[in-house]
C-alpha cells in the first residue's frame, strides 16, 4: 500500500520543463486528479497535499530542496505521518530507459540518480518503490557526431527540455502510469507491474 508519492525535480520556473523534472509532472497530474493544490509546507521542505486517489488517502510531495537534497523533504513528511519506506513511491526520470517506457520496482540501487541516492541515505534503506520514467540517454538521442560521453553531457541533457516527440512519449508513459497506480496504491503491486509492464 502506498501512502506517500514523491515526485522528483528541481524547484523554479527555469527547470519546470526539463527532463529531470519528469517526477514533478506526474505528481502535478495526480494533484489535478485528486482536485487538490500542492502548497508550500516549510516543515516538509516542499510542496505537499493530501489527496483522495481511487478511494485511498495519499500524500503528494514535490521536494523544493533541489534534486540532490530530496531525502530531506521525503523523510520529514514520512516521519511526521509515520509512513514506512515500503509505503513510499518515488517518481523520477530514468536515463537508462527510452522515452515512452516506464518501469516500477521496489528497492535496488540509485543508478547514479542523486535524488534517489539522497532519499536512500536519509531513509537508511533502499526498500522504497520507484516509478522510473524513461527520458533516454544523450548517447542514444542526440544527433550523430554530437559528443555525449561524459558526465557533463548527461548533466546538460537532464537539465534541458525534451524534444517534442520525446515529450509526447513521456506524456504517454505518465498516462500508462496513472492506469497502473490504483493497483499499487491499494497494495496490489504485482497487478500494477503487470498492467504497467505489458502496456503498449
From Swiss-Prot:
The keyword Hydrolase applies. The keyword tRNA-binding applies. It is found in: Cytoplasm. TRNA binds at residues 15, 66, 68, 114. Hydrolyzes ribosome-free peptidyl-tRNAs (with 1 or more amino acids incorporated), which drop off the ribosome during protein synthesis, or as a result of ribosome stalling. Catalyzes the release of premature peptidyl moieties from peptidyl-tRNA molecules trapped in stalled 50S ribosomal subunits, and thus maintains levels of free tRNAs and 50S ribosomes. Belongs to the PTH family. This is Peptidyl-tRNA hydrolase. It comes from Ralstonia pickettii (strain 12J).
Amino acid at each position: 500500500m502506498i501512502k506517500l508519492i514523491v515526485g522528483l525535480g528541481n524547484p523554479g520556473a527555469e527547470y519546470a520543463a526539463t527532463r529531470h523534472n519528469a517526477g514533478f509532472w506526474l505528481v502535478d497530474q495526480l494533484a489535478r486528479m485528486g482536485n487538490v493544490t500542492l502548497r508550500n509546507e516549510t516543515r516538509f521542505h516542499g510542496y505537499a497535499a493530501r489527496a483522495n486517489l481511487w478511494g485511498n488517502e495519499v500524500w503528494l510531495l514535490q521536494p523544493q530542496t533541489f534534486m540532490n537534497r530530496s531525502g530531506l523533504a521525503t523523510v520529514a513528511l514520512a516521519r511526521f505521518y509515520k509512513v514506512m519506506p515500503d509505503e513510499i513511491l518515488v517518481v523520477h526520470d530514468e536515463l537508462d530507459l527510452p522515452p515512452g517506457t516506464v518501469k516500477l520496482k521496489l528497492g535496488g540501487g540509485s543508478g547514479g540518480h542523486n535524488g534517489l541516492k539522497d532519499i536512500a541515505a536519509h531513509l537508511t534503506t533502499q526498500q522504497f518503490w520507484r516509478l522510473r520514467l524513461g527520458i533516454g540517454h544523450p548517447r542514444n538521442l542526440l544527433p550523430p557526431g554530437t559528443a555525449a560521453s561524459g558526465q557533463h553531457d548527461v548533466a546538460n541533457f537532464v537539465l534541458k527540455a525534451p524534444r517534442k516527440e520525446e515529450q509526447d512519449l513521456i506524456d504517454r508513459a505518465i498516462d500508462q502510469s496513472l492506469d497502473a497506480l490504483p493497483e499499487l496504491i491499494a497494495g496490489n503491486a504485482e497487478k500494477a507491474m503487470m498492467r504497467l509492464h505489458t502496456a503498449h
